[in-house]
Amino acid sequence: MKSTRKSATQRRHRRLRRHLSGTSERPRLAVFRSNDHIYAQVIDDVAQHTLAAASTLDPDLKKSLSSTATQEASAEVGKLVAQRAIAKGINQVVFDRGGKLYHGRVKALAEAAREAGLNF
């Protein structure tokens, strides 16, 4: 069977998730990137509960963004998810890049979240 980019991403994500798990003390910051948007969630895997979330589809962000598929938009999502997590008392997270390479939009989101106060 021919290996496609999507199947390679899914394989990488399965490999990553074997070792990554979020707890209530240190939840998982999960990132999903599509061609048009980027989504970030802070997840407690033990309780199976989403604690904070942000995306380029948020009404707060969508108005101020000229394009949702840029590194600048990803950085804004990173700042917003970090602010929402810190408001709920979450400072430490485990970063889950979702099988994507740590480059470009995923990297921009992670660095913006770090600058906003999340530790990972």
Swiss-Prot record:
* Region ranges (Disordered): 1-26
Q: Which InterPro entries match?
A: Ribosomal_uL18_bac-type, Ribosomal_uL18_bac/euk
- Output the GO biological process annotations, alphabetical, semicolon-separated: translation
UniProt keywords (A-Z) are: Ribonucleoprotein, Ribosomal protein, RNA-binding, rRNA-binding
Residues of the signal sequence? none
The record's note on quaternary structure and interaction partners says: Part of the 50S ribosomal subunit; part of the 5S rRNA/L5/L18/L25 subcomplex. Contacts the 5S and 23S rRNAs.
Q: What is the protein named?
A: Large ribosomal subunit protein uL18
What is the organism of origin for this protein? Answer: Synechocystis sp. (strain ATCC 27184 / PCC 6803 / Kazusa)
